[in-house]
Design a protein with these regions (language model features):
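Short linker/helix segments within small regulatory modules
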Residues: 57-67, 159-168
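Short metal-binding segments enriched for Cys and/or His
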Residues: 72-91, 99-110, 176-190
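A broadly conserved sequence feature marking short terminus-proximal activation segments
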Residues: 2-49, 86-147
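Short cysteine clusters
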Residues: 45-48, 70-73, 153-156, 172
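Structured alpha/beta or helical-core interaction and ligand-binding surfaces enriched in interleaved
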Residues: 51-54
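Amphipathic alpha-helical interface elements
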Residues: 8, 20-28, 35-39, 77, ...
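Short acidic, glycine/proline-enriched loop segments that cap or flank alpha-helices
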Residues: 57-61, 83, 293
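"Short basic amphipathic alpha-helical interaction patches in structured regions
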Residues: 61-62, 84-89, 239
Length: 357
């Protein structure tokens, strides 16, 4: 039993708890929070309540006045506000054990002063109080979700782990646009990989109900969104007057040629020549297919045939999408994202194009 607790002054405390100070207002305690087998411990957003994990060594090296970011929703607050439910329960147990002993000792002191012998005659009351020793139980452990992989922020090098789509480093805040794009493309690949791991019966049922087709369509839709978000972020970061340059152009970054034109007009390289011709052509077909499913349920129309003149589909037919075509589209989109990121990596862009007067 003695190995499960330690004595601190007049109090028995469970392992992992120590009293670090006292004053007129109360007592200050230190309660250890165990890490997992990788040396990571949990943080929980006070706003969205989702969990993430941070390497304990990296965390200890950060300043005490650190403002932590939720990796999912971007809420930022003092790091002490990110205590997890299990960590809070552990701390409350430590405080509760101390409180039980403190109250017991206060009662013992009070009754010892009040205790008097019974009078030899007449009416009277004899008061006695006997306290029982308190032996604290071990603190509850921490058994939170285990990490899948370790990430490291390219900006601050802090190592952390997430359990869902995220947009922020716990220390630096918003992730670079290219990191967000890379993660999004990785998620699309992982989703296709997950489909391939389904049981045969489940796979057949989902395929018959059109679930696979809907996922393939969603993949193309998401790829366009990834490129739009990345291109817009890169463009806005590179040009102080970006808002003026895209004013009145609608969703220009959803369109491949318009995206390329915006960058070339600003003096940057032409995306159409940064990629090989076959990759650019496949991307154009993917973008046209996505547009067709979004606006015409995948049924071929004249607009599609104009964009993809080499298509063997006829007007009125519904296009089909395969897993292989989705994987190729992801690979091509990855190449496009790398090219977009590289556009502004050069020291200085060429002189912007100026229309003839």
């Amino acid at each position: 039993m003695a190995g499960m607790w330690s004595s601190s002054g007049r109090f028995r405390l469970p392992d992992g708890v120590r009293i670090v100070g006292r004053d007129s207002d109360g007592v200050r305690m230190s309660v250890s929070m165990p890490t997992d087998e990788h040396g990571f411990f949990g943080r929980q957003c006070p706003s969205c309540s989702q969990l993430f994990r941070v390497d304990s060594d990296d965390y200890e090296a950060l300043p005490d006045d650190l403002e932590l970011w939720c990796v999912y929703c971007g809420h930022h607050d003092g790091h002490s506000e990110f205590i997890t439910d299990q960590q809070l329960a552990r701390a409350k147990r430590a405080v509760g054990d101390w409180a039980v002993q403190s109250i017991g000792r206060s009662l013992g002191d009070s009754f010892s002063r009040m205790s008097t012998p019974a009078p030899r005659s007449g009416f009277g009351i004899h008061i006695s109080y006997r306290s029982r020793p308190f032996y604290p139980q071990p603190l509850p452990g921490i058994d939170e979700e285990r990490l899948i992989r370790i990430r490291a922020c390219a900006g601050c090098a802090v190592r952390y782990a997430v359990f869902g789509e995220h947009r922020y480093c716990p220390v630096c805040g918003p992730l670079p646009a290219n990191v967000v794009a890379s993660d999004a493309l990785g998620a699309e690949t992982a989703r296709l990989d997950g489909l391939a791991q389904l049981a045969t019966d489940a796979m057949a049922t989902l395929r018959e109900q059109g679930v696979f087709t809907r996922i393939y369509v969603d993949t193309l839709e998401n790829l366009v969104g990834v490129v739009e978000t990345l291109a817009k972020a890169v463009f806005n970061a590179a040009l102080p007057d970006a808002a003026l340059k895209i004013k009145g152009k609608g969703n220009a970054f959803q369109r491949l040629n318009d995206t390329a034109d915006l960058f070339t007009a600003a003096g940057y390289s032409d995306l159409r020549t940064m990629l090989d011709a076959s990759t650019w052509q496949r991307l154009k077909e993917v973008w046209a297919t996505r547009h067709l499913f979004t606006h015409n349920d995948g049924v071929v129309d004249d607009k599609y045939l104009t964009k993809v003149p080499a298509s063997t589909a006829r007007r009125g037919q519904r296009l089909t999408i395969t897993e292989q075509s989705c994987r190729q589209a992801i690979a091509d989109t990855q190449a496009l994202c790398l090219a977009i990121t590289a556009l502004t990596a050069a020291p200085e862009p060429a002189a912007p194009l100026v229309a003839d007067q």
